């Protein structure tokens, strides 16, 4: 049976911590979809389309990874698209407390047997979050080594564009 996995987040921006989880998950499953969640409550740095394009470009070398976006319940998206695994990344025990609660709720909502698999972020990336990256970048700090090169270029270009306004 082909395994179709889903890894979700807002990815605004995609960080090296996200990349680490995606790269490792891509080796475990036949197909991996990076599901970009639309969250109107969050002020986004990049549009959904920009995030999707950046993720697709960054993940090209992996071969079996694609990006998509969705809104609404994760369980609805999983059931509609036939995923058998939901991958979640963990940085700390605080992440685990939240993620286990969500996994248990989702298990009630999934139509079929869908497993939630937790992958620990590598230690070098455990302190990285999209929020921290955005804050450091907005204050003029270096985010090199915190995000993939494609994302770094896009963030620098966005900053330059905003300075010109």
Spans of features found by a protein language model:
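Nucleotidyltransferase catalytic core that binds NTPs
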Residues: 1-165
């Amino acid at each position: 049976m082909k395994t179709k996995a889903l890894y979700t987040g807002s990815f605004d921006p995609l960080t090296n911590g996200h990349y680490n989880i995606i790269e490792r998950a891509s080796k475990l499953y036949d197909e991996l979809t990076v599901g970009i969640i639309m969250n109107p409550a969050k002020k986004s740095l990049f549009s959904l389309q920009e995030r999707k394009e950046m993720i697709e470009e960054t993940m090209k070398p992996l071969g079996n990874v694609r990006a998509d976006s969705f809104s609404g319940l994760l369980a609805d998206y999983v059931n509609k698209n036939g995923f058998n695994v939901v991958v979640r990344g963990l940085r700390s025990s605080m992440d685990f407390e939240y993620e286990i609660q969500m996994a248990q709720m989702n298990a009630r909502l999934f139509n079929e047997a869908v497993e939630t698999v937790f992958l620990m972020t590598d230690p070098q990336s455990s302190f990285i979050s999209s929020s921290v990256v955005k804050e450091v970048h907005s204050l003029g700090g270096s985010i090199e080594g915190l995000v993939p090169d494609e994302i770094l270029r896009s963030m620098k270009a966005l900053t330059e564009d905003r300075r010109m306004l």
